[in-house]
Amino acid sequence: MLNRRDLLKSASSGVGYLAFAALAHEQALAESKADGPLFPKKPHFEPRAKRVIFLSMRGAPSHVDMFDYKPQLIKDNGKPGKYGRGRGGKLLGSPWKFKQHGKSGLWISELLPEIATHADDICMLHGMHTDLPNHPQAQTMMHTGSSQFVRPSIGAWTLYGLGTNNADLPGFVALGAPNGNANHFGSSFLPAIFQGARFSGDSRRPGGNNRFARREQKPKIPNIANPKLDRELQRAQLDYVQSLNKAKLAREKHAPGVEGVIESLELGFRMQDTLPELMDTTGESKETLELYGIGSGGNDSFGKQCLLARRFAEAGVRFVELSHGNWDHHRNLTNDLSARCNEIDKPISGLLTDLKRRDMLKETLIVWAGEFGRTPHGQGEDGRDHNNKGYTTWMAGGGVKGGLGYGATDEHGYEAVEGKMHIHDWHATILHILGLDHEKLTYNHAGRDFRLTDVHGAVAKDILS
């Protein structure tokens, strides 16, 4: 058996190396596209949607000010509260008005007038709850199903279960991903090829005063091109490295880490052609840019993310996650929540409109969520504390009943009391909509089968269309 040094010597001389590299390239390309881990797989049953666009609101938006109308909270404004960690704060009725929208009559705050026009396409999940009211643990739980251990993210599980529809692009993309938090987009013990491809940059959105705002990034492509080597030399270099990787894989038989490296390197090379063109939005019409709120003030950053999400979905990417930060309003709720809602309202509305007019919404599951909600009582002069006991997320598009308000919190919006949906149930439902049985989507690691929902999870069948 050749060792690494022998293989290096045998393949590094002149014409022999180039011929060897060409053959290795043909074999690698055929394997990566025909039977590699990213090759499209059959779902467990007929899917209701083909792809997911996950709108991640980092910092925990206030559900009682945006989507969960509580007239009793307004009536009891200023009365002593009985909820939360301090259990002594005064109840704080929402300072914003709610109205019913669409034929369904869904209640949505005046903070989100554009999203409200899509009420009949939205399924509100008012009975959400999660384990802990701490940002890092709750965000990890929302992404991976575990607050304590490093596990694959929901995007990685989705790609592992279904593969991709475009072998020249990542099957899982994270746009505007904040610095750090790699496990939110990671593959953990799954092969590395299933981790999310993160696109970020150096620009910060102005405003905000906490870590959830400061780390938000505008999408860009890091290191997509090699300025020192032309394409032919890059290909030759890559083929040689891949030959070493394949030799190692042949010796070790089962080495998912090596398999992931092989696939990732091939994908990275192919992306040099496809990705820059996909992320170039200069060819979009003025009407489309305006639809997403691009060029109209504070919406540019998230508007571009939403537009790119549509382009990635259109190109066959299976799971796209968008990040928007600075929802942690312990103070200055009145000004900051209004600003954050203004930043997402038109872009999300534009995304829904654009998908619908392209006949893509019926095959795309849109998921909007923060890691938990906020308390019905105030904190300080003008803020709300963390609340994991009850909050709202919503879904729209393929597989869900539009215009439905599912579940409920108590009269003040503190605790889920009807249609309760834990994060495990939420994950099980998303996978079900994609045609995946959360109990059958497993991966053997360290002597046991793991899954996204661990030993929990029940599909919320009442919301399925």
Regions flagged by a language model, labelled:
Residues 1-465:
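Ligand-binding pockets and gating/stacking loops
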